[in-house]
UniProtKB/Swiss-Prot annotation:
Domain of life per record: Bacteria
Known role: ATP-dependent carboxylate-amine ligase which exhibits weak glutamate--cysteine ligase activity.
Swiss-Prot/TrEMBL keywords: ATP-binding, Ligase, Nucleotide-binding
SUPFAM superfamilies recorded: Glutamine synthetase/guanido kinase (SSF55931)
The protein, known as: Putative glutamate--cysteine ligase 2
Amino acid sequence: MPLPDFHVSEPFTLGIELEMQVVNPPGYDLSQDSSMLIDAVKNEITAGEVKHDITESMLELATDVCRDINQAAGQFSAMQKVVLQAAADHHLEICGGGTHPFQKWQRQEVCENERYQRTLENFGYLIQQATVFGQHVHVGCASGDDAIYLLHGLSRFVPHFIALSAASPYMQGTDTRFASSRPNIFSAFPDNGPMPWVSNWQQFEALFRCLSYTTMIDSIKDLHWDIRPSPHFGTVEVRVMDTPLTLSHAVNMAGLIQATAHWLLTERPFKHQEKDYLLYKFNRFQACRYGLEGVITDPHTGDRRPLTEDTLRLLEKIAPSAHKMGASSAIEALHRQVVSGLNEAQLMRDFVADGGSLIGLVKKHCEIWAGD
């Protein structure tokens, strides 16, 4: 399929997607019943969309195009109410978190969807292993060239986004020692990590044309980059966050990305170059492994900075943009999180250290989601 023209959208508008876990009490393993839930709610959702993701244990909640995080929060709240009622009616529960702590990938059923079945044919067991749960945020752009500039700008802060949302320390019944283990699942995919370097939309069109020669890439949706342009929506999509345990944290993360995008496209503080990416995967690894306790390295100067310190610096820089976007509350909440040193990954570990089981952890996550 040829790459569509870049659809011009209103700059800095938002679209947010949350991949949720569908679980079966009282054992709290992943269910295989998302299709049943989607059928139950499809006529009751008035704004946004509830739809499939890769496997039958995943339920995606997606907003419509939103002006700001308050509108997005309202849509999510309404969807949450409908989904929780339908889940209760079918003896299921819903929770966030980037991974389910003890599910077995071999049990996951890929949805009966043409694209997902084609992806299963291409990637085999990797698709079942990709039963992990992320938050994606789309930001509107006025042109393809703006989208490429924004993508490179946001890529500088991928470690910050990962660390602030880290919520996947457990996988396959084991403490991974990572704050966010979810991104590691995609490391075997040939398109994992950052987008190959291009400097404008024309070069991106040539890149996509080259990728399509492999026959594995039919559309942008077949690319698993950390951040990708979405020409059919007219957006840049950030894909590195774990699904948070609460709606409020998900909305705060979206506000962070919206405000950062506004700062980047308004101030144009960087002259992007390919060398910016030399240490990308090392810095990304630091965030996945250690969260905000990680250390990032500047590829141009060699300077090393604690991620906590650099995140506080980012929040300060984007505060005026956050005010203009109506996202000041999000930046203030994230600032409190960084200063306090609290994060969802550590809270999960604390629960287990205090004697809680992994089954009890999932049950707790369901209670948190329903109570937010």
